[in-house]
Every structure is written in C-alpha cells, then in structure tokens.
Amino acid sequence: QMDNRTPEKVKFLWEAGFRQVVLARELSIREIRKIHEICPEVPLEVFVHGALCVSYSGQCYVSQACFGRSANRGECAQFCRLPFSLVDSEGKVIVKDKHLLSLKDMNQSDELERLLDAGASSFKIEGRLKDVSYVKNVTAAYRQKLDAIFARRPEYVRASSGTCRFDFKPQLDKSFSRGFTHYFLHGRSEDIFSFDTPKSLGEEMGTMKEARGNFLTVAGLKSFNNGDGVCYIDEQGRLQGFRINRVDGNKLYPQEMPRIKPRTK
C-alpha cells in the first residue's frame, strides 16, 4: 500500500518504471478523474469492495507499534476494530466501550460505470483472510455488473478472455460485511462507521414484535428458513445471536429463547 493519492506521485511511479498504479481507497471520484486527466497513460486500479482502514492506506503503524505486526506486510492486528471509550478533558465518559474507529466495508458495486468514466482501468476487491464463499459471491456480483456495462458500452473492452457462468444469484449482503458505505467517493459523509460491532451483521430481516412461550413473532422484510442464524444488537449495544429451529409464517422457534425486546431489529 503506497498511499497513491496525488497525480505527482502517480506520475513519478510511472516514470520510475511501474506500469499500473493502485490508488488509495480514500480518493473521491473527482480526484480519480483528475489523476487520470494528468496521467492518461497510466493504468489505474481502484478499490471497490471490502474492508477499509481508518487511517490513510499504507500510513497506519499502530499494529506494528502495539503488536509488532506490520499492516504493510499483510499482518494487521486490526487495532481499529477494538472497543474504545471516549472521555473528555474533565474525565466525563462520553461513549463507553464502542468500536469508535471501526469503519463499514466499502461497496462501489453501483458506481462501477462512473469509475470507468473517471479513468479506472481495473478494480480491486479487498479479500484478506476471506473464505471461498466470500470470494465466489463477491467476484460473481461484480463480474455480472461489469458484463452488463460492457454490453451497453462497446468502447470498454475486457482485458481477460473467456466467459463466466453462475448457477447461483450473487448477493453482496449475503457475504461478510460490517454494513456498506461509498466512503469518500462522493465526498465526506457521516454514515461510514460501524460503532456497535466489527463483526458481520448480514442483511436486515425484520423487527421483533413479541416473545411468547417458545417462539418469537417477527414483522419480516424477508422470509426466514429452518436453521437460519440471526443476530441483533441488545440493549447494552452488544451483538447477540441465535439459531432458528423452525419457522411457521412469521413465528420463529429458536433453539434457545433469547432475551430480546420488542421492536429490536
């Protein structure tokens, strides 16, 4: 991670012999376009999906300083995913035990055409320590979106050959994520953090209406299935979860009844 944020640095790398430059995750689409306009001969690779670093790409040394594990050598200890308390100058606790530095995951799947038009020539999916199902689902989702763009825009040509066929419907919210954000692509925004948990939340399924006996009644946005695992944030702001043994309409019969309040999502 070389923190490639400026046209000057990209131009220097090109003149030094590099033939493709990976841009930093923190750039806006306007900044990407500016780099391409100043350095049109340089193929630019842009991050589009996966985990985000709360520091500038390649400029965080907390993991090395605290744990002796270099983030720039693929050994980040993920210090920014730990819980922290925010205390003011008088010792008053403003926030207690929240994941104040934990960012959501990047998802630019609906911005690919704009990124191509801005000058991106390839896309990068962050996948350190991800499993096979994550790789399969996420790459399939982006492959289909790119193929749809290429079908409409003949001026864009694939660098690879061959075709991909899928026997499933890729869904990005089915794979690990801390929630999604466009990050700084359209400028600074507030909704980029996942304060409650650094773990995967999955897709929103509905709201709990009531608990009675051995079942929960849910106002569902989507259907549940026997054996599903579900999670929720409890009153203390902690991530909890349980497994569903049986589903009967909007009634869920858990393996073990959780302590969950009505109106919990």
PLM segments and residue spans:
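Gly/Gly-Pro- and Ser/Thr-rich, intrinsically disordered tail segments characteristic of DNA damage-repair
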Residues: M2-P7
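Surface-exposed amphipathic alpha-helical tracts and adjacent flexible/coil segments at the periphery
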Residues: E8-K265
